Amino acid sequence: MKKQPLISVIVASYNYAKYIKETLDSLIRQTNKSFEVIVVDDGSRDQSLPIIEEYANRFKNIKLYTHPGNQNRGLAETVKLGIEKSNGEYIAFCESDDYWTNNHVEYLQDTIQQNPLANFIVNGIKVINLSNNPEYDS
């Protein structure tokens, strides 16, 4: 059997304390554990950072990075730092207010293996409102 590729999941976070726990919970519930999570906090002023620190301390595949002096540098610089810190063959992005189905990493890895010449993969999304009801499904 072919070795599963390592995927680096980059989560850029800025003042998402309300959602980041659910996002990280969805990542640690993945059926395939062959991936790393790179969370870059962009100078949050809410309680995001302590929540992320707790996860990074509890789970060895979650790494936390911040900009020097915990500055706010914007999304582009935050994503760039995440890419620089990643170790994966492949990069996936998870927004800090999103959550993934439990088999999403497995789906990505299977798709990569089935399409070795692909430069990128795009998958469908489901938009869930604040009442946890689907609003859009692609």
Regions found by a protein language model. Give the residues of each.
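Nucleotide-sugar donor-binding/catalytic module of glycosyltransferases
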Residues: 1-138
